[in-house]
Amino acid sequence: MNSLRDYNDELKDNEGRKYNYNFDINVMHHYMLKSMFPFFKDGNLLELGSSMGIFTERFIPYFDDITCIEASAEAINMAKKRFKEKVNFVHSLFENVILDKKYDNIIMTHVLEHLDDPISVLKRVNNEWLSDNGRFFLICPNANAPSRQIAVKMGLISHNSAVTEAEKKHGHRKTYSLDTLEQEAKDAGLNVIYRTGIFFKALANFQWDRLLETDIITKEYLEGCYQLGQQYPDLCSSIFLVCEKDKK
């Protein structure tokens, strides 16, 4: 990350995009955790980029030892009010942080696309922070989500992997697909043991937010979108890798 960036400002909603949609918090966070849970290891947890701690809260029942690294001081202050002493927060850039132990579970959710030099940070995960038998959970927005492909056909976005102006204001640097995400993980020395998508998604986040205010969408429909996403990972809202240290 670039020390000249204003990470507090990047958290703010802008005219083209909210930073957090209800769809993210109430739907995607549930299915992200559901996707990760079978792969959790016993031990501690490091979350890379915790923002205000909204997703962090879902890990409390599963881990007693949680550390979060976050670049935004404002986000950390809000998160500390939420968790008190339950979570250890470190205000730092990933490039600069010094950690005094290794972690059995490391989670990075919708953060890698914000980094100026993602491979260097992934190398730190592999070489410095991940325990020998630990697992790294990496989730990013998907360039090939149908909602995004439809936006391209509508002329709203130039191409699937484009970074929109609204995304740039939120600090996005690139938009990953499964192949580009996996390649960067491998370039950093990580061993990808599992890959999938999370939640088939044909509507934009703001459209989902409107639908969720009605009785049109049922829990069964949401579960159906999740299950369909397992069959068609390249057409999901998010893409997901589980990685371990390369044993070679």
What are these regions (language model features)?
Residues H110-H114:
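Short catalytic micro-motifs in class I SAM-dependent methyltransferases
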Residues S3-Y7, G16-V27, I54, E74, ...:
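S-adenosyl-L-methionine-dependent methyltransferase catalytic module, highlighting the catalytic core
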